[in-house]
């Protein structure tokens, strides 16, 4: 049984990338194959990704777009507040986190960005329902601020508004970027197309819960946050075709991985094949999980003790990930959202009994 301490490591703070590199594909890429022992580690640059995958493989991208979900404002009393939109729930409604000296009650009016008023509705722990006076996606885009992760120490600027989005982002709804996708630019996508690599998209709107720390030593007691995803029939068909020709399904990012595996696990439990799915998922992937769809994973380097570090450890093997992270720190890779990437190959045998 793994505990929270098993996923801790010491990271020099200067390795936390604070800004994006000027060129998306200039990031480094650590290729990790845990299917052999000891694990094979190869230092590359992200522009070399096409040489690591084969014609007929399928890359699965998350096309969610980050909302300008952060607001500063005030109560009618003048008290200052900070609001982070968690998800849009309707044309004029959203769930949000509110930081204030005292939690606002239902019916309270809040002034956001000195531009418009919202009304607080019912509490949906730990969030508040907000009612907007106009379509909330429009007001969020016009007046909000990009919500950079807490470990990035500068306020979002015009560069972040471009670089903290993937080039293929098209469905607004996330409050954090699917960061593995930040390394792809249009020329790289076109090169992959030209060599016969297939592409498909799904949508998973990344919530603020992605930064939620695990507070229990027994990780089985952790309650995972829930996120909405849409896995279309076109992707299901491409997965089937990829399997038929012997290709690999490669998830671009842990969000793509979670959507694919959530849909596949649900299908498994219902005794049916993978099908188009729109649903909430709180899937928590830890060592012992049996992967059903994904063969390889493009991902960034994750925080100590995080659920995402547990996910990649489940996928590639705990000792493989430990070795890869030690190597990355020794070689001064850049970590977290604006950092470098890994290309992982699935470990064939789960390390403990699991789902």
From Swiss-Prot:
It comes from the Bacteria. It is found in: Cytoplasm. Keywords: Cytoplasm, Queuosine biosynthesis, S-adenosyl-L-methionine, Transferase. It holds the Pfam family Queuosine_synth. GO terms for molecular function: S-adenosylmethionine:tRNA ribosyltransferase-isomerase activity. Its main location: cytoplasm. Gene3D superfamilies: QueA-like. GO terms for biological process: queuosine biosynthetic process; tRNA wobble guanine modification. The keyword S-adenosyl-L-methionine applies. One of its GO terms (cellular component) is cytoplasm. Pathway: tRNA modification; tRNA-queuosine biosynthesis. It catalyses: 7-aminomethyl-7-carbaguanosine(34) in tRNA + S-adenosyl-L-methionine = epoxyqueuosine(34) in tRNA + adenine + L-methionine + 2 H(+). Its EC number is 2.4.99.17. Belongs to the QueA family. Transfers and isomerizes the ribose moiety from AdoMet to the 7-aminomethyl group of 7-deazaguanine (preQ1-tRNA) to give epoxyqueuosine (oQ-tRNA). HAMAP family: QueA. Monomer. This is S-adenosylmethionine:tRNA ribosyltransferase-isomerase. The lineage of its organism: Bacteria, Pseudomonadati, Pseudomonadota, Betaproteobacteria, Burkholderiales.
């Amino acid at each position: 049984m793994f505990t929270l301490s098993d996923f801790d490591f010491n990271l020099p703070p200067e390795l936390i990338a604070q800004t994006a590199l000027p060129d998306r594909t200039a990031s480094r890429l650590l290729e990790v194959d845990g299917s052999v022992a000891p694990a094979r580690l190869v230092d590359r640059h992200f522009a070399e990704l096409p040489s690591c995958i084969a014609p007929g493989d399928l890359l699965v991208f998350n096309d969610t777009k980050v909302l300008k979900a952060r607001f500063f404002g005030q109560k009618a009393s003048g008290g200052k507040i900070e609001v982070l939109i968690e998800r849009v729930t309707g044309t004029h409604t959203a769930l949000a986190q509110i930081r204030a000296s005292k939690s606002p009650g239902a019916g309270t009016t809040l002034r956001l960005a000195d531009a418009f008023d919202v009304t607080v509705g019912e509490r949906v722990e730990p969030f508040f329902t907000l009612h907007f006076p106009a379509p909330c996606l429009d007001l969020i885009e016009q007046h909000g601020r990009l919500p950079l992760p807490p470990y990035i120490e500068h306020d979002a600027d015009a560069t972040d508004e471009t670089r903290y989005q993937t080039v293929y982002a098209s469905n607004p709804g996330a409050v954090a970027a699917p960061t593995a996708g930040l390394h792809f630019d249009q020329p790289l996508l076109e090169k992959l197309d030209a060599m016969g690599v297939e592409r498909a998209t799904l949508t998973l709107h990344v919530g603020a819960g992605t930064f939620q720390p695990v507070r229990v030593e027994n990780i089985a007691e952790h309650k995972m946050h829930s996120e909405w995803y849409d896995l279309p029939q076109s992707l299901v068909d491409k997965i089937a075709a990829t399997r038929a020709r012997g290709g690999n399904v490669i998830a671009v990012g842990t969000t793509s991985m979670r959507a694919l595996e959530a849909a596949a696990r649900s299908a498994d439990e219902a005794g049916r094949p993978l099908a188009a799915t729109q649903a909430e998922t709180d899937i928590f992937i830890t060592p012992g999980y049996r992967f059903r769809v994904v063969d390889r994973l493009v991902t960034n380097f994750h925080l100590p003790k995080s659920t995402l570090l547990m996910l990649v450890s489940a996928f590639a093997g705990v000792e493989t990930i430990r070795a890869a992270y030690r190597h990355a720190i020794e070689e001064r890779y850049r970590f977290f959202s604006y950092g470098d990437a890994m290309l992982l190959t699935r470990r064939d045998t789960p390390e403990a009994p699991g789902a």
